[in-house]
């Protein structure tokens, strides 16, 4: 018959803990455990424990070694990333400077083109003004000549009578004969 009176049922029907050391056989359990440890120490328990500790040690060392390798790889990748970042910053600065230079050059080209267009427009305007002035002057001359001719004809018509008309014709005929004789001498 096995006596396990570690837990007992009190008469009231509740749950409780037996604190009587003699009734729970704690001394017997301690003696059995002590003998097992003493006998197992030299045989297999020590080997198993040593093997377990050695395996655990190797696992920990392997984990540490793997962690160190990953740390070295991560450090190398970080350094490479920093190098690429620095190169990217340098390239970005070059692009920014080139962009600003290009923008200034294009701005200056636009200013120069606008100045050239302005100069050409000014020249064209001045040329058009001179042309229009010449045309206006020519129109005024033609009008003045026409008016002068009309007045002269009007004056001649009012003053010219038959006798004056005959004298004018004779005078011009004489001029033409004189011119004809002069040209015959040169030939």
Swiss-Prot record:
Q: Name one GO molecular function term.
A: proton-transporting ATP synthase activity, rotational mechanism
Into which family does the record put it?
A: Belongs to the ATPase B chain family.
What does it do? F(1)F(0) ATP synthase produces ATP from ADP in the presence of a proton or sodium gradient. F-type ATPases consist of two structural domains, F(1) containing the extramembraneous catalytic core and F(0) containing the membrane proton channel, linked together by a central stalk and a peripheral stalk. During catalysis, ATP synthesis in the catalytic domain of F(1) is coupled via a rotary mechanism of the central stalk subunits to proton translocation.
Give the primary localization class. Answer: plastid
Its protein name is ATP synthase subunit b, chloroplastic
| Lineage, highest ranks first | Eukaryota, Viridiplantae, Streptophyta, Embryophyta, Tracheophyta
As for membrane topology, the entry says:
Single-pass membrane protein
Residue ranges of the TM segments: 29-49
**InterPro entries in the record, alphabetically?**
ATP_synth_b/b'su_bac/chlpt (IPR002146)
Question: What is the protein's quaternary organization?
Answer: F-type ATPases have 2 components, F(1) - the catalytic core - and F(0) - the membrane proton channel. F(1) has five subunits: alpha(3), beta(3), gamma(1), delta(1), epsilon(1). F(0) has four main subunits: a(1), b(1), b'(1) and c(10-14). The alpha and beta chains form an alternating ring which encloses part of the gamma chain. F(1) is attached to F(0) by a central stalk formed by the gamma and epsilon chains, while a peripheral stalk is formed by the delta, b and b' chains.
- What keywords are assigned to this protein? ATP synthesis, CF(0), Chloroplast, Hydrogen ion transport, Ion transport, Membrane, Plastid, Thylakoid, Transmembrane, Transmembrane helix, Transport
User: Which PANTHER family does this UniProt record tie to the protein?
Assistant: ATP SYNTHASE SUBUNIT B, CHLOROPLASTIC
Q: Anything else of interest in the record?
A: In plastids the F-type ATPase is also known as CF(1)CF(0).
Q: Which NCBIfam families does this chain map to? A: PRK07352.1
> Where in or outside the cell is it found?
Plastid, Chloroplast thylakoid membrane
What GO CC terms are in its UniProt record? chloroplast thylakoid membrane; proton-transporting ATP synthase complex
């Amino acid at each position: 018959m096995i006596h396990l009176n570690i837990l007992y049922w009190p008469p009231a029907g509740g749950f409780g803990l037996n604190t009587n050391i003699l009734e729970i056989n704690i001394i017997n359990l301690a003696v059995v455990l002590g003998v097992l440890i003493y006998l197992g120490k030299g045989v297999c328990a020590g080997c198993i424990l040593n093997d377990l500790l050695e395996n655990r040690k190797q696992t920990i060392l392997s984990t540490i070694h793997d962690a160190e390798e990953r740390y070295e790889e991560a450090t190398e990748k970080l350094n490479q990333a920093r190098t690429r970042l620095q190169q990217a910053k340098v390239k970005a600065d070059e692009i920014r400077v080139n962009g600003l230079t290009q923008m200034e050059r294009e701005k200056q080209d636009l200013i120069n083109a606008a100045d050239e267009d302005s100069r050409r427009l000014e020249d064209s305007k001045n040329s058009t003004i001179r042309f229009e002035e010449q045309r206006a002057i020519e129109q005024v001359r033609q009008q003045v000549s026409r008016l002068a001719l009309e007045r002269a004809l009007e004056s001649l018509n009012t003053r010219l009578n038959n006798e004056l008309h005959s004298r004018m014709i004779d005078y011009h005929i004489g001029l033409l004969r004189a011119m004809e004789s002069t040209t015959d001498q040169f030939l």
